[in-house]
C-alpha cells in the first residue's frame, strides 16, 4: 500500500508476524537498486534487523550502495533496551520517499530518516488481542478493559486499564505521549490497528483534536488503517516534531494508494443559522410547582432508559429509552429558560426544545403534540383537554 512514486520502491514481506528471509530482502535490493543506492527502513524487531542487516551486507559485497535505518518509536516500555517499531515508521517512509523523489542522494535521505526517527513517538491501545491464523487466540484482555502500549504483533503492553470511552482512551495515550514531546509544532498520525470501525476512529480523532496537546498539533494523518495487527480492535497515535520542510514533504503528492494524505489542523468554522431558522423564544418565567413536576417527569424518563430500550428492542432498534433520556436531560438543562408560569407558551417551548434535541420519529411526533397542545391552550381549553 505504500509503494508508489514519492514513497517506497519495494516492500519485502515474510509470513504473518515473521520477518522475511535474508534472501528475500536481497532479491528486493537487487531488483530495485540503481547507481543511487538503496535505503532500507526497518522496524525494530530482532528478526527484521538480522535479516535486513545480512541482506544489506551481501548487497554491498555485490557493489551496491545500501544504508539501513531502524525505527524504534514505541514509548510504552521506556525501560526496554530496544524500543519497538510502530506506526511512526510511516513518517520515515513519507519524508525519505519524498526526498528521494525530489533528487536527494542516499546520504541525505538516510540522515533525514534518522532525524525523523529521533523525532517520532508512538503508543497504542486495544480492547482485544489479534487472531493469528492457525494459532489459538490469547484472550488476556478481560471484557471492559483495554491494554495500553501493546505491540503490532500482539506483544504485551505496559498495563491494562478500565475501558471508559474514547475521550478517556485518548487521554491515557496522550498523557504518555505529551511527556516525551518537545515544545513546538508536531504532526500526528492516528492509526486503526485493524478492527476499529470508521465511527470509532472518527470519535477517537475528535477526542484527540480536543485534547490538551491540540495547540502543538499542526498537521494530521488519518484516521486510517495504516499499520494494522490483523483484527486487533484498537488504535495507535504517533507524533513527530516538525522541522523545516517536513510539512511540505508530508503533503507532497504520492501515488502510494494507502497514504491518506497530510492535512492541516484548523478550528471548526461555525456559521450562524440562516434567517428563519433561529428559534424565537418567549421570555423565561419562574413557577416552582411546574418546575418540580417537569423535573420529576424527566428524571423518571432518565431512570427508565434501560427498561424502555429493552422493550423497544423486542420490536424495534432498541433506542427509545436512550432517545427519551437524552431529551429529558436537555429539558432539565433548559428548565430555567422556559416560560414555566405560562402553560400555553410552555407547551410550545417544550415542543421547540424537543424538536432541536430529540431525533427520530419520537422527536418530531412529540414536537407536533406539544405545539398542538399550545394551540389548544391558547384557544381556552383546560390542561387536561389541551393534552388529549
Identify the meaning behind each predicted range:
Residues 1-388:
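N-terminal loops that bind phosphate or other acidic moieties
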Amino acid at each position: 500500500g505504500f509503494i508508489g512514486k514519492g514513497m517506497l520502491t519495494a516492500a519485502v514481506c515474510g509470513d504473518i508476524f515473521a520477518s522475511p528471509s535474508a534472501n528475500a530482502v536481497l532479491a528486493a535490493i537487487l531488483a530495485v537498486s540503481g547507481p543511487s543506492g538503496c535505503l532500507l527502513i526497518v522496524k525494530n524487531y530482532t528478526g527484521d534487523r538480522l535479516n535486513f542487516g545480512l541482506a544489506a551486507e551481501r548487497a554491498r559485497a555485490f557493489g551496491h550502495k545500501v544504508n539501513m535505518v531502524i525505527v524504534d518509536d514505541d514509548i510504552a516500555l521506556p525501560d526496554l533496551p530496544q524500543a519497538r517499531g510502530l506506526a511512526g515508521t510511516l513518517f520515515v517512509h513519507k519524508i525519505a520517499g519524498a526526498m528521494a523523489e525530489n533528487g536527494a542522494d542516499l546520504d541525505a535521505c538516510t540522515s533525514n530518516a534518522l532525524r525523523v526517527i529521533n523525532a517520532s513517538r508512538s503508543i497504542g491501545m486495544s480492547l482485544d488481542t489479534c487472531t493469528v491464523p492457525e494459532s489459538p487466540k490469547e484472550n488476556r484482555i478481560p471484557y471492559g478493559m483495554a491494554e495500553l502500549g501493546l505491540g503490532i504483533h500482539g506483544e504485551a503492553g505496559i498495563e491494562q486499564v478500565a475501558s471508559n470511552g474514547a475521550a478517556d482512551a485518548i487521554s491515557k495515550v496522550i498523557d504518555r505521549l505529551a511527556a516525551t514531546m518537545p515544545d513546538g509544532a508536531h504532526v500526528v498520525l492516528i492509526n486503526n490497528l485493524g478492527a476499529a470501525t470508521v465511527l470509532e476512529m472518527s470519535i477517537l480523532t475528535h477526542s484527540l483534536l480536543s485534547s490538551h496537546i491540540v495547540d502543538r498539533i499542526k498537521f494530521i494523518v488519518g484516521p486510517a488503517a495504516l499499520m494494522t495487527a490483523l483484527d486487533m480492535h484498537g488504535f495507535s497515535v504517533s507524533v513527530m516534531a516538525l522541522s523545516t520542510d517536513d510539512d511540505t514533504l508530508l503533503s507532497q503528492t504520492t501515488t502510494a494508494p494507502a497514504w491518506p494524505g497530510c492535512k492541516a489542523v484548523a478550528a471548526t468554522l461555525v456559521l450562524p443559522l440562516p434567517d428563519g431558522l433561529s428559534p424565537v423564544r418567549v421570555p423565561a418565567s419562574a413557577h416552582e410547582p411546574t418546575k418540580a413536576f417537569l423535573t420529576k417527569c424527566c428524571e423518571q424518563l432518565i431512570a427508565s432508559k434501560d427498561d424502555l430500550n429493552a422493550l423497544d428492542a423486542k420490536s424495534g432498534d432498541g433506542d427509545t429509552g436512550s432517545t427519551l433520556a437524552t431529551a429529558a436531560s436537555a429539558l432539565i438543562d433548559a428548565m430555567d429558560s422556559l416560560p414555566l408560569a405560562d402553560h400555553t407558551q410552555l407547551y410550545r417551548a417544550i415542543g421547540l426544545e424537543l424538536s432541536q434535541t430529540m431525533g427520530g420519529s419520537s422527536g418530531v411526533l412529540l414536537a407536533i403534540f406539544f405545539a398542538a397542545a399550545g394551540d389548544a391552550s391558547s384557544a381556552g381549553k383546560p390542561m387536561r383537554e389541551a393534552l388529549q
